[in-house]
Amino acid sequence: MAENWRSRIITEGIQRTPNRAMLRAVGFGDEDFNKPIVGVASAHSTITPCNMGIAALASRAEAGIRAAGGMPQLFGTITVSDGISMGTEGMKYSLVSRDVIADSIETVCNAQSMDGVLAIGGCDKNMPGAMIAMARMNIPAIFVYGGTIKPGHWQGQDLTVVSAFEAVGQFSAGKMDEATLHAIEHHACPGAGSCGGMFTANTMSSAFEAMGMSLMYSSTMTAEDAEKADSTELAGKVLVEAIRKNIRPRDIITRKSIENAISVIMAVGGSTNAVLHFLAIAHSAEVPLTIDDFETIRQRVPVLCDLKPSGKYVTADLHRAGGIPQVMKMLLNAGLLHGDCLTITGETIAERLRHVPDTPDPNQDVIRPFDQPLYATGHLAILKGNLASEGAVAKISGVKNPQITGPARVFDSEEDCLDAILAGKINPGDVIVIRYEGPVGGPGMREMLAPTSAIIGAGLGDSVGLITDGRFSGGTYGMVVGHVAPEAAVGGTIALVQEGDSITIDAHRRLLQLNVSEEELAARRAKWQPPAPRYTRGVLAKYAKLVSSSSLGAVTDRFV
């Protein structure tokens, strides 16, 4: 296959004289028209520390592509900052941005007949957005993570942005003074890079490394270290070789490689958002995957890494301890990883791991020995019951009380709930319900980091449950259950909950139950009316019309 297998349609022949004329204006010479044209999709932005270092990485990617004999073409895609928009109306655009990113990369690459694409992302939705596009297009592709932020430091503590969210709850509960709150604000985010714990961005980048779509060790590098830039240049070279070898995303993104990714997510204690995003990636790659598959994998894979939000360490510590390859090698040796899966380098997972030690360095405790795991089984549990017949997702690591039955405290928006928590109106034993925040109802399925952090900060993390048809940040922990489906806006049972109803959350039995008779629920359902759309124009209105259930990945192109 010719290296310029797609771009030749715009570079060859007399009829393409005008096309070549425009390409000459952006730097092409006579010798370049037979080279593969490789897109560099850059999510550089100064609205968030997650993405503010990506421009320099994009330049290194271009250099790598050129050195390997390709012609890079740089273009931009968007990002939003989940951390900055958290707790506001703006957070409704976060999950929407995943699909905008996917659509934008697909649009540019296909419009310009690119032979391959290297995407660089930082904030949470950059990763799944780029991978969805790659899986859809199935042209040679590689993902480069912009890198994790280094931890902040204050009074001997490692800080992350979640420290600041939790400090708000502590301050509101009278457990922290304003000077301490201000100090944490100043020290939590010391520079460039994505939020530092095993939150959503680091979870997804780690999963892509495990899946074979990113270079090994690249997902845990810090954004500001030289090795991140060097790895990015190498990724450009590897992609050009993948074009020559005709290695496509769907050769790599298979059922087995997705199982590998999910296994690593469980082992590192990753974000609940990974469930939503991998359902969407599998849909784009036409790989059969259901929400129940996560539960199957959870039951066989232990949590091996002691990482924030519920653990001790940050992702930079994981890198020093051996990174994702060390975790993968342990899973491979235990028969929990498919070693025959292809990677973007052309080697298999087993081949790439052949030089990785069988056991972690005994002089660190970020990665536990396989026979001494943090938890014997995975932490992302799929709960079902009359409140979530299609399923819901709970992160059960660090939960001291895995079962709670209590009175429902019902809120139809995140803001109303947060106000109640900060005003001291939530009591131990309560089960908070935040509804009409799902993919359709929000729309956009906001993350509930502000309420959950306020609960933790108020000292209620072990005594209060929270369920929602919205999402949770990767920084959330506690007795919280999200992605409840069907959601309230489409008539799910969560819409029928009334203040004071008894609700049971049982992580051991994987049960989410409204303790109300079927007769009473039928009577309530007969009276229920769907709410009017919150938006009738613009991207949120379009999204609400197109988006599927969270149990199907909240995708916007499921038409059959």
From Swiss-Prot:
Chain sites annotated for binding Mg(2+): D82, D124, K125, E447
Matching Pfam families: ILV_EDD_C (PF24877), ILVD_EDD_N (PF00920)
SUPFAM superfamilies per the UniProt record, alphabetical: IlvD/EDD N-terminal domain-like, LeuD/IlvD-like
Record EC number: 4.2.1.9
InterPro entries attached to this UniProt entry: DHAD_IlvD/Edd, Dihydro-acid_dehy_C, DihydroxyA_deHydtase, DiOHA_6PGluconate_deHydtase_CS, ILV_EDD_C, ILV_EDD_N, IlvD/EDD_N
Cofactor note: Binds 1 [2Fe-2S] cluster per subunit. This cluster acts as a Lewis acid cofactor.
GO biological process, one term: isoleucine biosynthetic process
Enzymatic class: lyase
Keyword presence, Lyase: yes
Catalytic residue positions: S473
Biological or metabolic pathway of the protein: Amino-acid biosynthesis; L-isoleucine biosynthesis; L-isoleucine from 2-oxobutanoate: step 3/4; Amino-acid biosynthesis; L-valine biosynthesis; L-valine from pyruvate: step 3/4
Record's keyword terms, sorted: 2Fe-2S, Amino-acid biosynthesis, Branched-chain amino acid biosynthesis, Iron, Iron-sulfur, Lyase, Magnesium, Metal-binding
Keyword set includes Plastid: no
Cofactor annotation: [2Fe-2S] cluster; Mg(2+)
Function: Functions in the biosynthesis of branched-chain amino acids. Catalyzes the dehydration of (2R,3R)-2,3-dihydroxy-3-methylpentanoate (2,3-dihydroxy-3-methylvalerate) into 2-oxo-3-methylpentanoate (2-oxo-3-methylvalerate) and of (2R)-2,3-dihydroxy-3-methylbutanoate (2,3-dihydroxyisovalerate) into 2-oxo-3-methylbutanoate (2-oxoisovalerate), the penultimate precursor to L-isoleucine and L-valine, respectively.
Complex formation: Homodimer.
Family membership noted in the UniProt record: Belongs to the IlvD/Edd family.
Protein name: Dihydroxy-acid dehydratase
Lineage of the species this protein comes from: Bacteria, Bacillati, Cyanobacteriota, Cyanophyceae, Acaryochloridales
Gene (name only): ilvD
